[in-house]
């Protein structure tokens, strides 16, 4: 087990999740109509996501950036017939990681790819980089597991940025 400090972005997301939950619990306790079921039922998942990587949330792709991505996406001939409003709605429910990975898939959207710093902006990724450097210095290899394919998708991009060769296996492989 390796202890990892969260980055400031992770700490903020973690704190926000706790604050949302406290507010929802106070609202429920005060007898207010419960709009907070989503907040209270997903708090543990939000905390896990915050502890893993900030790109598991949508905070960098605001509405303006999603609109620009959708407009560029339909510039590709294979997507020219798609409905712009439907794309905006579809993109709005995706995470920053998913949207950046989508942007990587076409030269029309490549300008929307998040920079390496955003992919590396996780305490766990920084600890993993240090461990990889140590393992490689010894001439050894490593095996990385995650319960979330979305985390593995992020790690693949991070490994690419670190220029670490890898083979990925998921339940979809």
Regions found by a protein language model. Name each.
Residues 47, 126-129:
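Conserved alphaE helix
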Residues 133, 137-173:
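Conserved helicase motor "Helicase C" RecA-like lobe of SF1/SF2 P-loop NTPases
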Residues 118-119, 128-133:
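N-terminal flanking helix/linker immediately upstream of nucleotide/cofactor-binding cores
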Residues 3-7, 33-40, 114-121, 141, ...:
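Amphipathic alpha-helical protein-protein interaction segments
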